Amino acid sequence: MTKKQRALEIIERLKKEYPDAGCSLEYDQALLMLVSVRLAAQCTDARVNIVVEKLYEKFPDVDALADAPVEEIEAIVKPCGLGHSKARDISACMKILRDKYQGKVPDDFDELLSLPGVGRKSANLVMGDVFGKPAIVTDTHCIRLVNRMGLVDGIREPAKVEKRSFGRSFRRRKAAISATDWYITEERYVLPEPILIAKNAVSVISVKKSVYKSWW
């Protein structure tokens, strides 16, 4: 079995095992996802969802967040940890969205990367889940799993894993498979290993032994 065939087979098995998988971050617009992924660093999605709801109640749009004192943002996001740096990034990011992008979240990967507090992992998450574009959220958990599954060979650098994975034919929309079918989160369900995603953009599921035991 080629690596391309293995990748497609893995995704198909996971889609059958978890047909209703979904992203655990709650959002109904690009702005909320952008804020959520910044707050999610070293924090659970469940707590992020609670905090973002409170933040959005007080500051319901880009303009409100851009004008808000950093101290007020920090007071709300503090339960997520790293409150000062996260509040500072959110404030700076909202100012750029207001002044450069007419209050809209850009759907271009490089433009997302230029925003304060947005790295490759966050940019890929927004690109895949919000805009439905091919994207791979590559973190240490993803790297460990794709190496274990044999989809990459001993590659540990996130950017290289991302690039190599894009070459595995995840772009085949007709087969309902794209690079956005992969996402790793630190939450754990069945295994003490991180969860693997396999359903459109960033659908969160845990990998059961019955699903993957024959992959390596």
Predicted features along the sequence, with ranges:
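Catalytic cores of DNA base-excision repair glycosylases
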Residues: 2-216
